């Protein structure tokens, strides 16, 4: 289990590295998907399954809108790949900042805490995941509807902008 958590943490950091170097929006979205899958997998392995699923669905919806908008604005005929020297320099700088942060923050001291799952306290522990489910269905349903409507509206606006000036409501005057 420890190796699996370490693997998910490494995938999360590598996804952040892929987004931070961001040679092109085509490759940046791969880093976003990798980071979101690793983060939600980490929550899932800790026992927070419903919140992990909701975060994954909302985050993928947001990433879809950002990806469509970025690709529409950056139509490069020759996009940079991750093997270019500038992108490798960004990656080395990101890893350097990460190493300095671990040295200053005391990386070795973090191993003393360990990983605690949701149900590790005992039989009568309250799972925060199912408490969150009750809040989603009672008080949070209106907010989820507003957030879903906003994502759908943003997607249609971006698709209208991508379509061009020839047809649609947005025209050159």
Swiss-Prot record:
Pfam annotation, one family: Oxidored_q3
Assigned keywords, A-Z: Electron transport, Membrane, Mitochondrion, NAD, Respiratory chain, Translocase, Transmembrane, Transmembrane helix, Transport, Ubiquinone
Membrane-spanning parts: 1-21, 27-47, 48-68, 87-107, 139-159
Domain of life: Eukaryota
Mitochondrion keyword on record: yes
Bilayer topology annotation: Multi-pass membrane protein
GO CC terms of this entry: mitochondrial membrane
Catalytic activity: a ubiquinone + NADH + 5 H(+)(in) = a ubiquinol + NAD(+) + 4 H(+)(out)
Chief location of this protein within or outside the cell: mitochondrion
Top enzyme class: translocase
EC number: 7.1.1.2
A molecular function GO annotation: NADH dehydrogenase (ubiquinone) activity
InterPro entries named among the record's database cross-references: ComplexI_Subunit6, NADH_UbQ/plastoQ_OxRdtase_su6, Nuo/plastoQ_OxRdtase_6_NuoJ
Cellular localization per UniProt: Mitochondrion membrane
Keyword Ribonucleoprotein: no
Similarity section: Belongs to the complex I subunit 6 family.
Role, per record: Core subunit of the mitochondrial membrane respiratory chain NADH dehydrogenase (Complex I) that is believed to belong to the minimal assembly required for catalysis. Complex I functions in the transfer of electrons from NADH to the respiratory chain. The immediate electron acceptor for the enzyme is believed to be ubiquinone.
Listed name of the protein: NADH-ubiquinone oxidoreductase chain 6
The encoding gene: MT-ND6
């Amino acid at each position: 289990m420890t190796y699996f958590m370490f693997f998910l943490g490494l995938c999360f950091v590598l996804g952040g590295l892929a987004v931070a170097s961001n040679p092109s929006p085509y490759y940046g979205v791969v880093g976003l998907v990798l980071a979101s899958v690793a983060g939600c997998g980490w929550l899932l392995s800790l026992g927070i399954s419903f919140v992990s699923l909701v975060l994954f669905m909302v985050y993928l919806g947001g990433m879809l809108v950002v990806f469509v908008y970025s690709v529409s604005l950056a139509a490069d005929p020759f996009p940079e790949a991750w093997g270019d020297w500038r992108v490798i320099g960004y990656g080395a700088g990101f890893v350097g900042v990460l190493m300095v942060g671990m040295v200053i923050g005391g990386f070795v001291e973090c191993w003393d805490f360990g990983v605690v799952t949701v149900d590790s306290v005992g039989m009568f522990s309250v799972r925060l995941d199912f408490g969150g489910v009750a809040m989603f269905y009672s008080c949070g349903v209106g907010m989820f509807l507003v957030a879903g409507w906003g994502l759908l509206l943003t997607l249609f606006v971006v698709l209208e902008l991508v379509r061009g000036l020839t047809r649609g409501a947005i025209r050159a005057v």
